[in-house]
Amino acid sequence: MKYGRFLLLLLVACIILLISGIALKIFLVQQPFLAEDVPDWKVQELTPYKWELRSVDDPERSTTAWITRPEKMQCDTLIIVGGVEEGEKLLSGGGKWKYTGNTILMKQPVHSFLLRHYWKNWDLLDWWQIPEKIREETRHTLGALDALLNYVKGAKPEDTRFTDKVVMAGGSVGAPFPVILTSFAPEKVDGLMVVYGFTNFQRVIQPLLFNQGLIHYKLTENSTDFSMEVKITGLRLLTDFFSFLLANMLKYGEMETYLPNISGTPIHFINGTKDPLVPPEAYLPLWDNSPDPKSDTWVEGGHFNPGNPEDMLRTGKLMYEWADAQKLRSCKTVVQ
């Protein structure tokens, strides 16, 4: 009897210790980024339209930036960080991309890194370190974007491609990166755009996990079958828990933490009126915590679809018009 009680107490102590360890880990990893956290990266032009960005301290980490620009013109520059799936084809946009001037799209470095460190090969220690791994990927994305910004902003006088005006934009899950970086050095960024961006990660993540669970287990949400209702309730509780956990892991990416530190840089938000990923409670904290000058545009429809040429046309036009209204647009012919 005493032995059984001892085992029970030992089990309870182990559970409490595990929960405390997880809570401490999440608390440490969720702290906001500071300017000194941004690692050094460098830029190499492979061709006039394709650049390589690589970490200085960890050369295994690299990514690509694509540039589209008018020939023989010196123009302002728009630097874009897209969502997790967006790459070179985003700028082609089925021939619909209409932002004139220099447009640079940076692919998030997480793509190439994960290809070499595929999660199916992870051991238990790797999974335990996943909060730190995600934060490290975010940190290096900031480093790559910082290198790109400094490369364009610090162009030599003989480089006649760029004016001194740079606008940064982040789309969807790529939105936090320009915001975080701008908060560290707002004087470097002449305009900031948040395109279909969001905060309140738990509110965004939970429906995604829940819907994927319904599909995976072939469940129907409105079913009246008792056994199916039990499964759906269990699935909802699990997705509530994991979305809460993930949201707290990613708290350092909440843009409302950094937006108040931006001064003198105009900020513009582009949102969908019926975006299932970005309900009002996932956007309003961004607006409320943004300093003036700020503005927003509401586009009829759902979340931005980079594969839809009409979305590309509409979004590019809105970005162009806003930058022009802020007097950030300029292009002039370069005499060779």
Model-flagged regions — what are they?
Residues K89, N102-G143:
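Cap/lid segment of the alpha/beta-hydrolase catalytic domain
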Residues I180-F242, W298:
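Hydrolase active-site cap/lid region
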Residues W128-V167:
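Gly/Ser-rich "nucleophile elbow"/oxyanion-hole loop immediately N-terminal to the catalytic nucleophile
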Residues I262, H268-N271, D275:
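Short beta-strand/loop motif that positions the catalytic acidic residue
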Residues V299-M312:
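Histidine-bearing beta->alpha loop at or near hydrolase active sites
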Residues G93, P279-D288:
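Short alpha-helix in the alpha/beta-hydrolase fold that links the catalytic acid
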Residues A35-E71:
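N-terminal cap/lid segment of alpha/beta-hydrolase-fold proteins
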